[in-house]
Amino acid sequence: MPSKEKSKGTYHETKIKEWLDSLGVVCTKQIASGQHGHLRADLRSDITISLQTETLYVECKYRNVNKKSRFPNIWEVLENNDIAIFKKSEGGKNIKQIVLMNQDVFEKYTAPTLHKHRKELK
């Protein structure tokens, strides 16, 4: 029987995958990534995003903001991943999730979209 923490992690990884699905992002939840990620590079993250030419690796983290819980070091979370999604417990302000990405992913995928949709300054 899985531990309470493992079950909670799986639940929130599933919720984040559902959110990505709702945005039209083609992604797959990695089964047993936490158990075997240190053994196989393809299991190093919680979710993979499939693009035409490559795969992006996404790590999911959940924190209850009402309890004092240690926030993971973002540098460590992104060390072997392309994107990190931090989900917080419900309640509080408007921010429910924070998406962080490494510089290469931002430059390759996000910056061109921002450039395409920019408002010209007069």
What are these regions, as identified by a protein language model?
Residues M1-K122:
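Catalytic phosphate/metal-binding cores of nucleic-acid and nucleotide-processing enzymes, i.e., regions
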